[in-house]
């Protein structure tokens, strides 16, 4: 299965990634993608950019070298109520917002704490996707989170990078994938690229999706059209 839209990648603005925005877009073009979401880390991530960066992303052209560019963010969840580190005035100007738990932004708590945090983020109308929920550092009630995503029509990310950098993520991701299939919940397949060579790299995620016969119509970034249709569910009217 080939993905047409990269939904999760970082530029040098995140502070610990290694290419600029244009380099990431050009790499997406080389790999035959049709769209890319630039999702730099929110300001609570040490070394990342300020909220002004996200507010001003609107100056980035919608297309660069024929590739659709979606203005996004990987917001940090900063408390167990699911609050994030991006102000509303910036969120309103973004196309696609991922919310994630990161250990440098919020300590690990209980399963109940983590579950409440993710569900709180899911309820935020400006958030479209939950990032790497398979992280074993933040164990969750997976069924509760998946059911909340279904209720609010949000996507759950199956993060390919997790299989390399977050030990024991695979078992959690498989369980989440099965639950999303069971309940008809959207997923996004993201590389979480911090270097241009990893753009569109979702080989393990794609293998699991095929192995567990996940419905293609629930993969939001399977095609450019499916991604834009998903965004329209959340009030984003973007023309191809």
From Swiss-Prot:
It comes from the Bacteria. Its EC number is 3.1.3.-. Pfam families: PHP (PF02811). It is an enzyme of class 3 (hydrolase). Binds 3 Zn(2+) ions per subunit. One of its GO terms (cellular component) is cytosol. PANTHER family: PHOSPHATASE YCDX-RELATED. This is Probable phosphatase Athe_0620. It comes from Caldicellulosiruptor bescii (strain ATCC BAA-1888 / DSM 6725 / KCTC 15123 / Z-1320) (Anaerocellum thermophilum).
């Amino acid at each position: 299965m080939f993905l047409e839209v990269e939904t999760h990648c970082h530029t040098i603005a995140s502070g610990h990634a290694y290419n600029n925005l244009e380099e990431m877009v050009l790499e997406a073009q080389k790999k035959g993608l049709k769209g890319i979401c630039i999702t730099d880390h929110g300001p609570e991530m040490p070394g990342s950019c300020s909220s002004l960066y996200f507010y001003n992303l609107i100056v980035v052209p919608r297309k660069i070298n024929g590739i659709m560019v979606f203005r996004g963010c990987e917001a940090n969840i900063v408390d167990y109520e699911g609050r994030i580190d991006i102000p509303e005035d910036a969120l309103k100007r973004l196309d696609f917002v991922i919310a994630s738990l990161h250990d440098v932004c919020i300590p690990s708590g209980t399963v109940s704490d983590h579950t409440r945090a993710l569900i709180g983020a899911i309820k935020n109308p400006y958030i479209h996707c939950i990032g790497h929920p398979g992280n074993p550092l933040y164990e969750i009630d997976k069924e509760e989170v998946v059911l909340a995503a279904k209720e609010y029509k949000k996507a759950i990310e199956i993060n390919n990078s997790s299989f390399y950098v977050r030990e024991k993520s695979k078992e959690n991701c498989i369980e989440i994938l099965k639950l999303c299939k069971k309940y008809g919940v959207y997923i996004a397949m993201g590389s979480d690229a911090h270097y241009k060579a990893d753009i569109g790299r979702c080989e393990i995620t794609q293998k699991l999706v095929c192995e567990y016969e996940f419905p293609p119509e629930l993969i939001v970034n399977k095609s450019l059209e499916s991604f834009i249709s998903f965004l329209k569910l959340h009030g984003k009217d973007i023309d191809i």
